[in-house]
């Protein structure tokens, strides 16, 4: 398993004044207040916000909705375009 999103760029870390100029997308997701957020059986991890957990028979659509929620909130609140580092398999688009 691995993280859902790539780390942010150094330029974005500077622009957002992240602590110690961290490029951690987990930090960004936590600051957006999304740690622990659930959709269906999918949940953003309480331990590391750049992971999505299957807590109760999550569907691929649940995971995709969470990913899109994070991307939407990052764009709306921070003018940040997050990029996934996962690969999509199947008959759906990444958003």
Predicted feature residues:
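Phosphate/pyrophosphate- and phosphate-bearing ligand-binding catalytic cores of soluble enzymes
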Residues: 1-63, 77-95
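Phosphate/pyrophosphate-binding loops and the adjoining catalytic core of nucleotide-dependent enzymes
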Residues: 70
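Conserved ATP-binding N-box helix of the HATPase_c
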Residues: 74
